[in-house]
């Protein structure tokens, strides 16, 4: 077919007056998810049709969503230096994964099935500050440094994102 590492079939469903394409993406590194989606959109447009959504059956790796988000941000001339959660949400919207029903990345992305958020990571900043000021030896300097470093990196990313695509920067 037109795309490598992709198996697809399409048909028309009379009762819904819509066409449907079923795709098995064998290797997203050979043919990225967004390339498959864009190709289906192109083929539909040739027939005077429009893609109205997509659906994922089962689980998927995180990387194809991140790649798709970066692709769509590039098309918009925007910086891809945004938080992972924002990239995932952009990919979900851009690929229409939330059009036919809810798409919960916590349930659909393989890596999110195995992530455990420890007590410090899931703690609100004000609670973290209170915990640092307590008599307990942990969290200590390392955790405080990690928070300060991550805030500095976030601020640098914000400045970069504010200047991307603007003349004079």
What are these regions (language model features)?
Residues 1-127, 134-135:
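Long, contiguous binding/interaction regions
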Residues 19, 156, 161-164:
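Ribosome-associated translation termination/rescue signal centered on the conserved GGQ peptidyl-tRNA hydrolysis loop
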Residues 59, 73, 144-151, 163:
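A sequence-level detector of short, solvent-exposed, charge-rich linear segments
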Residues 132-159:
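Conserved phosphate/anionic-ligand binding catalytic regions in large, soluble enzymes, centered on
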Residues 165-169:
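A structural-propensity feature for long, helix-poor, extended segments
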